Amino acid sequence: MELVYSRTPSMAAKPTPFCGGCSHGLIVKSCAEVIDSMDIAEQIAWGGSAGCTGFSSFVTDFDSFNSPHCRAPTVATGLKRCNPDSVVVLYQGDGDAASIGLGDTLHAANRGEALTVICANNCIYGMTGGQASATTPVGAVTTTTLQGSEVPPIHLAE
């Protein structure tokens, strides 16, 4: 029988903690596939903080860390400076990277820290009930914007 699919080596052989239909599992799997194709898995320091993105360290076989809520860029900065040969990858949600943790994200970028930040932007605080976040589009109805959001969103990638 021809093998048409196999688990990428950097993904742990564990059940996913993510909800059915959620994109986190696919995003993390895609990241692991790219890291494996680049042959840098041994150099990876995979990090995150609160929220669903923090579960990503349980399904990968990378050296990993979780930080206090919204402080992943600050913790990662210290890790990178102490281990300059490491490849530091942060997996954060929009609430973590662009709302509550925007200051840490912005200042790490402004300092030119050698970090890779992957932001899973679902435009809401998904884990706590679907409240509007800083990236929620104008007009979007959430549990806290029943008439539609009136606040222009932050475009983190810009």
Give residue spans per PLM region.
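Generic secondary-structure signature for well-ordered alpha-helical cores
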Residues: H24-I27, E33-I40, R81-P84, N110-E113, ...
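Glycine-rich, charge-decorated loop segments at or immediately adjacent to ligand/cofactor-binding or catalytic sites
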Residues: G126-A132
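Short Gly/charged-rich anion-binding patches and loops
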Residues: S30, G103, H155
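Active-site diphosphate/adenylate-binding microenvironment
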Residues: E2-P68
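Thiamine diphosphate
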Residues: C52-G126
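Catalytic-loop motifs flanking and including active-site residues across diverse enzymes
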Residues: S23, I27, R71-V75, P152, ...
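Flexible, glycine/proline-enriched loop segments at strand-loop-helix junctions
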Residues: P17-G21, Y91-G95, A140-S149
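Conserved thiamine diphosphate
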Residues: S6, S133-E158
